[in-house]
Amino acid sequence: KEKESRLQLFDVLDESAFRKAPRLLHKYPGRVLFTASHCAMHCRYCFRRDFPYEKGRVEYEEELSYIQKDSSIQEVILSGGDPLSLSDPVLANLLSSLDRITHLKRLRFHTRFPIGIPERICSSFLDILTKSRLKIWFVVHINHLVELDQEVEEALNHILALKIPILTQT
């Protein structure tokens, strides 16, 4: 009850009505928002900064079951928290599970990690992306041009080298 009332207090987007599983929102046709369990950064514009995340949770049966049962869902948006706060083994398992859902076509990562922790875009993570049959997109959250240094550029270039489009959100 306390968790629910806390969520209602800080639910500025009125998302509670669209929650289909603990980490899954289905607000718009054809896509779902799959939220990560936590984030490594605190963004001042974050809508979910007070969200009652379940740290350490790496099983997503309810979320995957909901996606599997609704064939109108073609896109999964991995957001936050931040999906890159999950370990490579957890992400690999999640992407593998999503790959097996035949009606899915796209996977979108919304992340700030390439900006704040560019070394997260490492070879093991990139290898996970290459194994997916889904069309992957990245939406990178950038506050200001001064954040775009050489390390960030290299991280983004690693993603682009895989022919993965990158959009920005500020």
Q: Which positions does each model-derived feature cover?
A:
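Secondary-structure junction/capping motif
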Residues: 8-11, 59, 124
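Canonical Radical SAM [4Fe-4S] cluster-binding loop centered on the CxxxCxxC motif
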Residues: 28-58, 109
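Short, charged beta->alpha transition segments
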Residues: 18-22, 32-34, 60-68
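Conserved AdoMet/S-adenosylmethionine-binding subsite of the radical SAM
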Residues: 61, 68-71, 75, 84-170
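Flexible, acidic/Gly-rich N-terminal and inter-domain linker regions that tether
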Residues: 1-26
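Conserved catalytic-core segments centered on acid/base and nucleophilic motifs
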Residues: 34, 46, 75-84
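Flexible loop residues that form catalytic
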Residues: 51, 81, 112
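Amphipathic repeat-derived elements
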Residues: 2-8, 62-69
